[in-house]
Design a protein with these regions (language model features):
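Chalcogenol-based redox active-site neighborhoods
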Residues: 1-124
Length: 124
């Protein structure tokens, strides 16, 4: 998030023709509002934090975090860490132009299904 905030402040996003940035997470609206505020982006009109409460968008894009062939949280071992029926989205970055996904990068690997160790792979 710090890089995103800096890019907004110094005008790089606007200069690149980016009209809106959406940070989407499988969570509720209250958490997303608090996260935006925590990141110092509460006043931003360019960067919006959006709750995918029931993971509908995540599922439609095929980005549900899974492990051992099962939805995250429904298997044994490390993928059960978030609890039964937990839904999470893979770390992803997309460039969408007029509703068409032009570029989608997912930061994941067999040893890192969430992309936490390689967040730069989901940067455009």
């Amino acid at each position: 998030m710090p890089g995103l905030k800096a890019a907004e402040i110094d005008g790089r996003l606007e200069a690149a023709g980016i009209e809106m940035v959406y940070v989407v997470c499988v969570n509720d609206g209250a958490v997303m509002t608090a996260w935006k505020k925590d990141q110092g982006l509460a006043a931003s009109d360019l960067i919006e934090f959006v709750a995918d409460t029931d993971s509908d968008l995540t599922d439609a894009l095929g980005l549900q975090l899974t492990g051992d062939g099962k939805p995250y949280g429904k298997s044994t071992g490390p993928n059960n860490a978030l609890g039964y029926n937990s839904r999470r989205c893979k770390r992803t970055c997309m460039y969408v132009d007029h509703g068409v996904v032009k570029v989608m990068q997912v930061a994941e690997a067999l040893d890192d299904p969430a992309g936490d160790d390689r967040p730069e792979l989901a940067c455009i």
